[in-house]
Amino acid sequence: MGGGERYNIPAPQSRNVSKNQQQLNRQKTKEQNSQMKIVHKKKERGHGYNSSAAAWQAMQNGGKNKNFPNNQSWNSSLSGPRLLFKSQANQNYAGAKFSEPPSPSVLPKPPSHWVPVSFNPSDKEIMTFQLKTLLKVQV
């Protein structure tokens, strides 16, 4: 997990070399060191495998993978998706069925102060109209 090793390649230097020449030599050694690190990292990640060549080959094949033959038994087993869920459809589902409304006896009763105790038929009609308007149900 540690960092890559640093390769220092000694460059022959003479004592009378100008500063520009020394800077060039330093740049060359840095470039060589960075190239060695890049090669080392590529080998670690891809184990020396060239991924761009594989991508180019896949593109040339038109996206078709030639490594896997067309297996008819595999395709026929997936041809009917209903067969995959057939065993599950026969089992009873214990959850709520949302297609059927719950019976009024199961529903909780509203607090007494929400609803007046006595209703006139006209009050019920007005309340029904108001509820349908609020819920945007066609009257």
Swiss-Prot record:
Biological process, per Gene Ontology: deadenylation-independent decapping of nuclear-transcribed mRNA; nuclear-transcribed mRNA catabolic process, nonsense-mediated decay
Biased composition (Pro residues): 101-110
Predominant place of localization: nucleus
Comp. bias intervals (Polar residues): 11-36, 61-79
GO cellular component, one term: nucleus
Keyword tags: Activator, Cytoplasm, Nonsense-mediated mRNA decay, Nucleus, Transcription, Transcription regulation
UniProt keyword Transcription regulation present: yes
UniProt tissue specificity: Expressed in heart, lung, muscle and brain.
Cell compartments where the protein resides: Nucleus; Cytoplasm, P-body
Highest taxon of the lineage: Eukaryota
Renumbered ranges of motif SH3-binding: 99-105
Region (Disordered), start-end ranges: 1-51, 61-80, 89-110
Family: Belongs to the PNRC family. PNRC2 subfamily.
Subunit structure, interactors included: Interacts with UPF1/RENT1; preferentially interacts with hyperphosphorylated form. Interacts with DCP1A. Interacts with many nuclear receptors including ESR1, ESRRA, ESRRG, NR3C1/GR, NR5A1, PGR, TR, RAR and RXR.
UniProt remark on domains: The interaction between PNRC2 and nuclear receptors is dependent on the SH3 binding motif.
Biological role: Involved in nonsense-mediated mRNA decay (NMD) by acting as a bridge between the mRNA decapping complex and the NMD machinery. May act by targeting the NMD machinery to the P-body and recruiting the decapping machinery to aberrant mRNAs. Required for UPF1/RENT1 localization to the P-body. Plays a role in glucocorticoid receptor-mediated mRNA degradation by interacting with the glucocorticoid receptor NR3C1 in a ligand-dependent manner when it is bound to the 5' UTR of target mRNAs and recruiting the RNA helicase UPF1 and the mRNA-decapping enzyme DCP1A, leading to RNA decay.
Protein name per Swiss-Prot or TrEMBL: Proline-rich nuclear receptor coactivator 2
Annotated source species: Homo sapiens (Human)
Classification of source organism: Eukaryota, Metazoa, Chordata, Craniata, Vertebrata
